C-alpha cells in the first residue's frame, strides 16, 4: 500500500488470463487445495472476469449459483494482484459468517498454496474488520469491572456475572483477534451493549485506551 501511495502513477501488475486458467486446473493453485478437485468452467470464467475488471478499472457484477466456488474465484486474482504490487485489498462480505469463512479457511489455504508455488513471494495475510458491536470496549469494560460482579435473575435463578466477566477479561488478555463472537458469552448475564460501543459512543482519540 505504501508503494502505491508514494507513487500513485506507478503501473500495476495483474495476473494474466493464462495464469488464472492455470490456477483453476487440476494441477494448479486451486486444484492443489482440494482433494478430488474438478475444474469448473464457471469458476474459471468468473475469476478471469474479476481479473479483467481489476486491470480495466471497470465495475463487475456477477451472478453465480451454489457450488461454483465464488469466494476462491475472486480471491485468487485479488491475492495475486495484492502480492505483486505490495498493496492492501479489501473484501466486503454480506454476512459475518462468510467473513469468518474467508479469514479462517479460504485465505489461509490460499496463502499456504501460494507459499508452495512461490516461496520467494511476499506472504499473503489478512485481517478481519467487523462492526463496533463485535469488539470489546475497554473503557466500558473497566466501568463494569469497577462496579463489580452483580447478580442477575435468569429464568428464576440468581446467577453471578463473575464467570462471564472472568472469561471476557481472559479472552481480551490472550487473543489478538478480539472478536467476542467467538467467546459465546451469555449476554443475558453480561449484555453486549455494556461491553461494546457504537460509532456514536466511541470516544476515538479521546479514549484513555486509544491505541491499545
Where in this protein do the model-derived segments appear?
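A substrate-engagement module of RecA-like helicase motors
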Residues: 2-33, 86-88, 92-212
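Conserved pre-motif I regulatory segment
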Residues: 14-62
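Short, flexible loop segments at the rims of nucleotide/cofactor-binding pockets, characterized by
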Residues: 38-39, 65-70, 200-207
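Phosphate/oxyanion-binding active-site loops and adjacent basic polyanion-contact surfaces
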Residues: 39-42, 46, 70-71, 99, ...
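Walker A/P-loop NTP-binding motif
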Residues: 51-52, 72-85, 105-109
